[in-house]
């Protein structure tokens, strides 16, 4: 993350937030979802409920008025309060895993969404360092179309430097987390409509040497961050105003590029604070993150993909970080060379050699 840049503008941003006048708008004026669109929202609610019943009242009203089809939520602390709140919401259900709980949940509109199954991945202890909260996957139908959504909350903090020799380095942990999830998406969910979202705790627009999302960004024909324009736009549109940065992301696979490019597609960090008296009222009672929403018109997934060897990128060789030819080794930092001339430095945790 751009630590120094963030420090420079944090004080100014905080002052502007503090001086913002109380708005005449209320939570009743909030809106995002429509009946004609698939409306997906990710939101870190910051250890819900941070201010008890006051928080649950606000959050219930916010969720209802935003009218999302699916909410991927992070940092649920009190599961009893969460369940009680959702039970009071008409037409909404929740997904919450039993056993050890990492704060990840879904809330979905049962009138528009048919929940097919939900499960966690990478639950074994060997994955706890890069993925301290096991990714929560939900398979669902919307208007007869099947989609997968993966909710996660990456490890925070760091020093804006990826230490390739230290698996405990915060940036390295986030990079390995992305590698694991990308491998699951490409090996298990290939050809499916998949959405990865959550508080991923880093910037997507950094230079390659410090960008922990390289595994996705290096394959633009397969993956796209729906919130790219937010991340590269002005601070007023970012998801984490307290320490001005954009950390909450929505990534889609190529099966949803057409929808994302649609003329009615919308992606935004929703400014709830303006509808409840200003930022400090919001932060004290709800969260320090803004929800990030994606609204798209879903088209039938009837396209038949025909892959030919012409133009298809395939792996042609591997070297270690010193440039020496070497065989594939699981968990080792390697340089992958492809038939189109591109190269990628990555860690593969697959048991077999990637293609």
Question: Could you tell me what each predicted segment is?
Answer:
Residues 299-326, 349-355:
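Residue-level detector of functionally pivotal "anchor" positions at catalytic/ligand-binding pockets or at interdomain
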Residues 76-155:
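Structured beta-strand-rich core segments of catalytic domains in phosphoester-bond hydrolases
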Residues 333-355:
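C-terminal tail/sorting-segment detector
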Residues 10-20:
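Bacterial N-terminal signal peptides
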């Amino acid at each position: 993350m751009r630590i120094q840049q963030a420090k420079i503008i944090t004080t100014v941003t905080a002052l502007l937030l503090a001086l913002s006048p109380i708005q005449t708008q209320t939570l009743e004026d909030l809106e995002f979802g429509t009946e004609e669109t698939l409306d997906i929202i990710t939101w870190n609610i910051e250890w819900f409920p941070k201010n008890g019943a006051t928080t649950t009242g606000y959050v219930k009203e916010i969720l209802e008025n935003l009218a999302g089809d699916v909410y991927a939520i992070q940092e649920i602390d009190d599961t009893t309060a969460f369940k009680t709140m959702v039970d009071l919401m008409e037409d909404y259900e929740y997904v919450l895993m039993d056993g050890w709980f990492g704060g990840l949940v879904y809330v979905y509109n049962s009138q528009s969404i048919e929940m097919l199954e939900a499960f966690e991945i990478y639950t074994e202890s060997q994955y706890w360092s890069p993925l301290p909260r096991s990714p929560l996957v939900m398979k669902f139908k919307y208007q007869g179309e099947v989609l997968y959504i993966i909710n996660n909350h990456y490890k925070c903090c760091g020093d804006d430097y990826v230490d390739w020799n230290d698996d405990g380095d915060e940036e390295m942990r986030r990079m390995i987390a992305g590698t694991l999830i990308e491998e699951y998406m490409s090996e298990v969910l290939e050809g499916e409509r998949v959405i990865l979202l959550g508080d991923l705790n880093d910037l997507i627009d950094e230079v390659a040497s410090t960008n922990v999302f390289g595994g996705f960004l290096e394959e633009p024909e397969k993956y796209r961050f729906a919130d790219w324009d937010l991340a590269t736009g002005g601070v007023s549109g970012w998801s984490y105003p307290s320490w001005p940065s954009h950390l909450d992301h929505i990534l889609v696979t190529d099966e949803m590029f057409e929808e994302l490019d649609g003329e009615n597609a919308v992606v935004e960090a929703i400014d709830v604070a303006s509808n409840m008296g200003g930022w400090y009222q919001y932060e004290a009672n709800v969260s320090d993150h803004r929800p990030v929403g994606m609204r798209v018109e879903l088209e039938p997934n009837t396209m038949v993909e025909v892959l030919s060897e012409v133009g298809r990128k395939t792996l042609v060789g591997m070297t270690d970080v010193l440039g020496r030819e070497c065989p594939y080794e699981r968990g080792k930092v390697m340089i992958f060379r492809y038939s189109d001339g591109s190269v990628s430095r990555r860690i593969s945790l697959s048991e077999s050699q990637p293609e």
